[in-house]
Amino acid sequence: MTTDLHRVMHGVAIRKHGDARAIAGLAGLAVAKVENVLRGALAAGRVLEVDGKYMLTPCGQMMLAGEYSRFNDGLRADADFSAAYQRFEVINKDLKQLITDWQTIDVGGKRVANNHADRDYDQRVIGRLGDLHERFEPILSKLCGAEPRLGIYRDKLGAALDKAEDGALAWVSDAKLDSYHTVWFELHEDLLRILGHAREE
């Protein structure tokens, strides 16, 4: 079983420059509990705090890296969890292409930045995002079944998709929001850390 400190440190690693509330959501802990743990981690030199936002120190990174195998050995040995992760990686490639298609558009045979003036084009991409989400839901259910904490991503992805489908285009990929792409990226980072894999660029 993980400690509160590990869960908070893991949350800081996932939500870089996040505040206590954002970290609490990822850690699955109450905000007050996270604030208390962060104070201790700050005093121990494991995190840095700037204007209420936190990040790991080199010491904190080393401590966290050393704990992952100990706390996640069960998940790493779980064949169903690993299989679900591999299916996630297949869909991850599709999402990367979808986000490229969202952020750029073909004009005269050249890809240029999408200014989102073509509403029909945007709606087609959002429709594809909805289809991708439907394909991903059973995979995410498998992941959450093994690690219930991951349920926060199911809630956030669903909320972002709903907003995008309702016309709030920023919720597709805006890095300043818990957009679909932002939350997906954090889920990917979470899974990589759980399993001890490196991100492929």
Predicted regions and their residues:
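C-terminal regulatory/effector modules of DNA-binding transcriptional regulators
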Residues: 152-201
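Exposed, interaction-prone assembly regions rather than primary DNA-binding/catalytic cores
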Residues: 79-165, 169
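Accessory beta->alpha helical hairpin/"wing" motif in late/C-terminal subdomains of nucleic-acid enzymes
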Residues: 51-64
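A short, conserved structural fragment
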Residues: 42-52
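Intrinsically disordered, low-complexity terminal tails/loops enriched in metal-binding residues
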Residues: 16-19, 83, 103-104, 171, ...
